[in-house]
Design a protein with these regions (language model features):
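DNA major-groove recognition helix of helix-turn-helix/homeodomain DNA-binding modules
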Residues: 26, 45-60
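Short, charged recognition helix plus adjacent turn
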Residues: 13, 34, 52, 62-72
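Short, basic-rich loop-to-helix N-cap that marks the start of a DNA-contacting helix
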Residues: 39-49, 68
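Recognition helix of helix-turn-helix/homeodomain-like DNA-binding domains
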Residues: 26-41
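Short amphipathic helical patch at the helix-1/turn junction of helix-turn-helix
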Residues: 1, 12-13, 41, 52
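Short basic helix-loop element that most often maps to the first helix and adjoining turn
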Residues: 5-24, 49
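Conserved hydrophobic/aromatic packing and binding residues within compact polymer-binding modules
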Residues: 7, 21-22, 32-35, 61
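Short alpha-helical elements of helix-turn-helix
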Residues: 3-5, 29, 44-47
Length: 72
C-alpha cells in the first residue's frame, strides 16, 4: 500500500472528510488533499501530527516495511 492510499484508508476508517481532518493536524484541507493524491509529501511536523492523531508510530503511518530480522 502506498502512503497516499494509507492516508485515505485511515481517514475513511474514521469516517472523516478531508475538511474535518485537516484542522486537527494544523493544515488546510487543500494541502491535505495533495498528500492523499500523492502530489506532495508532508513535512515532518505534519507527519508527527498525523501519527499522533491516529495513534500510530511514524513507521506505521508511512507504511515502512522493516527487513526480515531487523527487529532482533
Amino acid at each position: 500500500m502506498t502512503f497516499p492510499e494509507h492516508l485515505l484508508k485511515l481517514r475513511k476508517g474514521r469516517g472523516l472528510k478531508q475538511t474535518e481532518l485537516a484542522p486537527f493536524i494544523g493544515i488546510s484541507w487543500r494541502a491535505y488533499q495533495t498528500y492523499e493524491r500523492g502530489e506532495r509529501e508532508p513535512q515532518m511536523s505534519t507527519l508527527i501530527a498525523l501519527a499522533d492523531f491516529y495513534g500510530l508510530s511514524l513507521d506505521e503511518l508511512v507504511c515502512r516495511d522493516w527487513p526480515k530480522g531487523a527487529e532482533e
